[in-house]
């Protein structure tokens, strides 16, 4: 192999390793068997959530994972692999790929990494069932508002009972 090709591959390994280090979550899938139309729709959905989706050779993924400190992730790089990287939303790639796999049986989630820790297929699927960041914030807000709402209702009830007594 020529030195130019080796240098190009080494550069690609470095780029992928940096993406792995910077990613909030990584999901590895086997997309073998997807039609071109399905793949286009999937890529559009992922792009809409600012998730980068690439098909990369396993040898490059293994070397990049090793360089990024995710050596255990190398076990999922078997057969054709596509990788979804998200730098912002931890849940988005798992949720989109899981929902898409329900309609496209050819898409299979293999595993991934969450906040720099290797995650199994089951952990990625569990992550996909969580609400997104906005949903979690709304849940937190409703939990925080409940005591205040209860106090306000109690004060209102006391005020009404004093009005009725007067």
Swiss-Prot record:
Q: Which residues form a coiled coil?
A: none
Highest rank taxon of the organism? Bacteria
Q: Which UniProt keywords apply?
A: Ribonucleoprotein, Ribosomal protein, RNA-binding, rRNA-binding
Under the heading InterPro entries, the entry gives: Ribosomal_uL10, Ribosomal_uL10-like_sf, Ribosomal_uL10_bac, Ribosomal_uL10_bac_type, Ribosomal_uL10_CS_bac
Residues making up the signal peptide according to the UniProt record: none
Q: Which molecular function term from Gene Ontology is one that the record holds?
A: structural constituent of ribosome
Q: Which GO terms describe its cellular component?
A: large ribosomal subunit
Alphabetical GO biological process terms: translation
Its quaternary organisation is: Part of the ribosomal stalk of the 50S ribosomal subunit. The N-terminus interacts with L11 and the large rRNA to form the base of the stalk. The C-terminus forms an elongated spine to which L12 dimers bind in a sequential fashion forming a multimeric L10(L12)X complex.
Q: Which PANTHER family match?
A: 39S RIBOSOMAL PROTEIN L10, MITOCHONDRIAL (PTHR11560)
- UniProt family annotation: Belongs to the universal ribosomal protein uL10 family.
Its job: Forms part of the ribosomal stalk, playing a central role in the interaction of the ribosome with GTP-bound translation factors.
Name of this chain's protein: Large ribosomal subunit protein uL10
Native organism = Streptococcus pneumoniae serotype 19F (strain G54)
List the gene name: rplJ
